[in-house]
Amino acid sequence: NKLNPLAPTHEYYVKTQKPSKVEVVDKEKDFYIYHYNQTGYTKDGKAKNIDYTASKKLKQHHYLVVSEKSHTITSYKEVKQSDIPTKAKEKL
């Protein structure tokens, strides 16, 4: 499971797109969940379908590194295009 400290963490690079779905949680409080479904790439350029959510709409055409552990997205952070490994960058 995702709490298993022995389970490896995998990183995938994605270029942000429009959300695939916007879920209204509380319209009065302006609270939404943005769902993203994209192809992510490992540092070696291997592709994988990545599903992740955000509590704010992400800017399009920005680069993220998404961390996955035991088939669960645990985090993501924005990275510069120059920090993306070449094989992943070629696919994005």
Regions from the PLM with identified roles:
Residues 1-3:
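Gram-positive cell-envelope targeting signals
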Residues 5-39:
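Short extracytoplasmic
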Residues 42-92:
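Structured, soluble extracytoplasmic/luminal domains of envelope-associated proteins
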